[in-house]
Design a protein with these regions (language model features):
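Beta/alpha (TIM)-barrel catalytic core signal, keyed to glycine-rich beta->alpha loops juxtaposed to Asp/Glu
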Residues: 1-175
Length: 175
């Protein structure tokens, strides 16, 4: 019903696209039963890759654009954290930033740092470049709190990854 109303607005030229966010597969299939969904935004990053199981294949099959949120895993995939970094904000409740999982994630990020260093790049730029190379990702919107971060993120466009490098990065975060 809601998607039908959005379709009417799209047909009238009042909106350009119909998008959904945080939908389960069941919800997405229901919303897209008439093929009207244009874009879905869902959590996806190198540390949380569940979208690869069903969501990304479904989106590709139905020509639905996919936009990941938390592409840098709340900063964890930027390389700025160490095991001694104080995590005092909302991240302290995120399992990615807790205990053994945090240390394991940091070890993976250090492997990324090796690849980034070889490419004379920062870890965050390498990760963003990896997204841009994925055929199932249509746009990446990394969060930025400072204007300088936006300018820094643009540097990802200058990193060219080979298929082998993308596979190497994916392999570091194998589920």
């Amino acid at each position: 019903e809601a998607v039908g109303a959005l379709k009417k607005l799209k047909d009238e030229g009042k909106i350009r696209a119909i998008g959904v966010s945080n939908f389960s597969m069941e919800q997405l299939k229901e919303a897209n039963k008439d093929g009207y969904v244009d874009v879905i935004q869902s959590e996806y990053n190198l540390l949380k890759r569940q979208a690869e199981d069903e969501l990304l294949p479904y989106a590709k099959e139905h020509s639905i654009s996919f936009v990941p949120y938390f592409p840098l895993a709340s900063g964890l995939l930027t390389g700025k954290y160490t095991k001694n970094s104080p995590i005092t904000d909302g991240r302290s409740r995120n399992p990615l930033f807790q205990g053994a999982a945090f240390e394991d994630n940091l070890a993976k990020v250090e492997k990324l740092r090796e690849i980034a260093t070889a490419k004379e790049a920062e870890v965050a730029h390498l990760v963003l470049a990896w997204y841009l190379k994925q055929e199932t990702i249509d746009a990446v919107i990394p969060g930025a709190k400072q204007p300088e971060q936006v300018l820094q993120n643009i540097k990802a466009l200058n990193i060219h990854l080979t298929d082998e490098e993308c596979a190497q990065i994916s392999g570091i975060f194998k589920r």
